[in-house]
Amino acid sequence: MYSIQELQTYINRCLPIFGLTQWKVEVSKHPTEEDNWADIEVSDNLWSATLRVSSDFWGLDNDEKRRIVAHELLHVHYSGPERTVESLNGVLGTEAYSLLSTVFEKEIERAADALSTVVARLLPPVDVHSS
């Protein structure tokens, strides 16, 4: 089976474990930037997100793929606070907003990294291959 389709099936299996049953997370055919294994963009529309993976993602071992999936799905839960911070752009002064957004982004990534290692163990084994 084509790897994007396998990953989509896997993501769909993981959504209930994350309490994201109302969400549609679509795996994009377009890769993310090469310096990221994956990224997720939560739409302004309710309950919709797009996951992109880099070409390097497919060469990772399956446990690392599972951890990365967990990391990205955690970001779906963080999208509300992230939008709150983004809404302050133009309200706060440039320096204050820059400081807030930089610190917030760094701390969200730290939280996702720490939690993804633990949460990944709750996910089913991943068996997603390169196309």
What do these predicted ranges mean?
Residues 1-63, 80-131:
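Metalloprotease/metallohydrolase-associated module, dominated by Zn2+-dependent proteases
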Residues 67-80:
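Active-site recognition of the HExxH zinc-binding catalytic motif
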